[in-house]
Each structure stands twice: as structure tokens, then as C-alpha cells.
Amino acid sequence: MLSKEGDFSKEQRERLSHFVTNLDSPIFALKNLPEVVKGALFSKYSRSILGLRALLLKEFLDGEGGDFLSEDLQDCELGIQKAADFYRRVLDNFGDDSVGELGGAHLAIEQVSMLAAKVLEDARIGGSPLEKSSRYVYFDQKVNGEYLYYRDPILMTSAFKDTFLDTCDFLFNTYSELIPQVRAYFEKIYPKDPEVSQSAYTVSLRAKVLDCLRGLLPAATLTNLGFFGNGRFWQNLLHRLQDNNLVEVRNIGEQALTELMKIIPSFVSRAEPHHHHHQAMVDYHLGLREQLKSFAQRYGEEREPSLEKGVKLVYGDPDGLYKIAAASMFPYSEHTYADLLDICRKIPDEDLMLILESSASSRENRRHKSPRGLECAEFAFDITADFGAYRDLQRHRILTQERQLLTTKLGYSIPQQLLDTPMEAPFREAMEKADQAYRLIAAEFPEEAQYVVPLAYNIRWLFHINTRGLQWLCELRSQPQGHESYRQIAIDMAKEVIQFHPAYKSFLKFVDYSETDLGRLKQESRRKA
């Protein structure tokens, strides 16, 4: 392996120094290389006896692939194209999907609806999304006299155009008008402590006000997202975007493909409309959706849908504690998992509890992760809560979440702080107006009707998660600085699991059950200190 001092000539070392972080250590990083060149380099790496630096020299710096180093723009693009051609051959001819994870791209996706943002964030593995916050950013701005929300072309050319526009404008007007009223009210009931800085108090108060009013924003509200994803992530996401039922989502898919083809073409070319892989994927998705939809309608029509709200544990693994104990001991044993399970079932309960407690007792804070053995016990929940809370919790990825259409049929949530205040009536009026508009539009356009539904309305989703993931989620999302809506969901999930079996309490010991006023005040005070 060419990596030791003296293996490279002085000239080679000079050339390599521009592209690797060191020339001698067996651990180094790449730099100053196009994504497609890095991807092609790593693809060849897995089939070569050479070290990566030697391979970089042979294939790209000294070979024909070195054209990308040229100061001449055309030669540079030619070199990148050669790397891209190789990469495409690997992907198409050998089917090595994993090489699609060897490069990636940052993509800004701006001025898309909050509804579409959820479709984008459905993609779980290989990508990292970041979205404009409804907690720190006011959504009351206008551009050219219009509030910033998505105007779906189907609705805008339908008989419901005026209903849609009037309702969204009414929701935004109510949101804008209530901001100063709620701020003044909170200043009165949550006065500033003399020991707290004005800046920390202001930030916390603003978060509280916007948390309280975000439920008025319709799902059509425009937001911005930033994504980093590897090539495989982008390819899979582009397939799904381009076969979505919503025009907006399909347009996002087309535009995203156009931009990604400019920087990582080899990674996403199989998502181009004319590519046989893409068309086969679209046909598969469409056929599967139609089949499952028909089954859901056929077998669900005789039962009235539940209107129950909140968190309900649907399934808890009856052997979960045995599985956790056995899997936690497995790396340190010579027995099979099956034998360890049998042992755990037969030992006295107090001994089983000792094993379980050992996986939890040494944790000093929520960032101390428990053993992976906790991943062997799983839970499933039905959750019916406001769409705003779903938007926050949906970003957790090491689990399974499936949502139903956003409607007004499951009612809405109103912040406790607004009850019995002058702000309650306008909030409820806005909800009722949105409900009327939704029901009119949904009769003809059930998917497009989602755009007019405010974030305060409830949505139902399935939440399937293992104990380790549940531990992370509940302990994180129950912290006082969180939004009260998802805080309550996290707390209720923890309570449901502990009620299922008290032994799980030791795994959830950093869940915060406290009631808070200005939840972010402590965190902001630390930030300003």
C-alpha cells in the first residue's frame, strides 16, 4: 500500500498535497475534489489493491482522468465528465447502489409549502434536513401585498379559488393581529425576572408567542429547507417526488433533479424521467398505492373511524424485557441469542431486573446512550395530535411513521394559555372558517384540500419505534424548552410504556415531566451568560 514516506516522489507528494489532508498517515481525508471524482475514486478503491492516494495518482492525477485539474474550463469539465461516465457505468451495469452513497450534495429548497416539506422529510436514511423555524421567525410578512403561501394551480383554476384564498388570508390576518395581543398578555402573566437578561427574556417570550400562534398557519404556508444528502438518498427521494399526487411536489422533484444533475449527475441520473429504472419505480409506486387504497376502503367501510385523540399504545412486545437483557449480554457471551433468551426467561425476576438496571443505572444524562440491546424491544402507538406537533416529531428517523391525510375531521388543539382570554374567540373563528373551506374543497379535491388546513388541526399517524429510539425521543422532546404540544406527546408515550411494564421506567429516567412557563428561558439565559 503506497502510503509511507518515500513511496511517492517529491513531485507526486506536491500534487497529492492539494487533495489529501496528509501524505503519511493511514488515516486522511480528501479535499478540493469534485463530488463525482470522489465517488468514482472510492468506487475503484473497493476493487483495487492500491491505497487511495496511489489510486488517485494513477487514475486521476497522472491518468486521463486528470483533466479536471486543468485551468482550461473545457478540459476541466471533460475530466469531470470522464469520472461521471465511469460512475454511471458502475451504477447501471453492476448495480452497486452502495456507491451512490460515496458522494453527496447540499440543496436549498425554498418557497415550498409546509405540506410539501413533510413529503421531502419523509426520506429518512442518507439525508439531513433543516427547516425554517415557526418558533423564531414571524410568518406575517407580505410580498407585493400577498401573504406567503402556496397557491395550488388546481385550486386556483377551480370553483374553490376564492374560498381557498379568502380562508388562507383570514388565517394569516388572525395570526398577524394576535401577535401583539398575545405578546402583551404574556408580558403580563410572565413578567421578567430582574436576574434574567432582557435579551434572554425577549427571545423566550417570542418563542412562546409564536409557539402559541403557529396553529393558525395553513399547511400552504411557505417555508425554506436545506438538505444535505448522499447520492442514493437523492435518487430515492427524486423517484418519490416525481410520482406524488400533488402538483407542487412533482414540480419540486423536477426542479431538484435539474439542479442536482448539474453537480452530481451520475448519482441521480437513474431518476431522470426517460430512464428505465425511474419508470419502473413510478409504475411500482402507483400500482402499490392504488392496491392498498382499495383494500383500506373495502375493509374499513363497515367501521366508523375513531375520533379519539392523544397517544395510545397499540402494541408492546410481551417478551421485550427478555430480549433487551439477552441482547445486552450477547456481545460479552459465547452463547447464542436463542440460548440467552431462554436463560433470561428462566432466571428469577430480581436477577432479570439487575441485568436491565445495569443497562440504565450508569447513565448520567440523556446523551449517554443505552446499549443496542434496547433496540430488540418494540412499541407501536396510534397518535392523534396537531399537525404542528407532527411536523416536529416526523423528523426523527430511526423508526417507522406513517401518516394519514391532513383533514379537519379530528378536531383541533388550542393552546391552554388562550383559553378564557379575549384571544380565544378569534382563534376559534379562524379554525371554524378553515373547517368550512376544507369540507367544501375536499369533496372534490381531498389531497389539495390539505393546503387550507391550519397546523392546529389534528392528524393521525402510526408510530412504531424500539426502546432505544423511544428513550432518545422521549428524553429529548420532553425537555422544558420544547413546544408544549410535542412535549406532551413525548411524556404520554413514556407514561404509556411505563404503564405497560414499570421496568421500562429505568430506561426513561431523564424524561422531564415538569410544567413550565417560558420554556426556553433557562436555555437562553445560559446562552447569554
Swiss-Prot record:
Superkingdom, taxonomy of origin: Bacteria
PROSITE patterns linked: THYX
ThyX domain location: 38-274, 309-511
Coiled coil regions, renumbered to chain: none
Gene Ontology biological process terms in this record: dTMP biosynthetic process
Gene3D superfamilies: 3.30.1360.170
Transmembrane segments: none
Alphabetical list of SUPFAM superfamilies matching this protein: Thymidylate synthase-complementing protein Thy1
Single Gene Ontology MF annotation: flavin adenine dinucleotide binding
Keyword list, A-Z: Repeat
Similarity comment: Belongs to the UPF0159 family.
The protein's name: UPF0159 protein TC_0921
Protein's organism: Chlamydia muridarum (strain MoPn / Nigg)
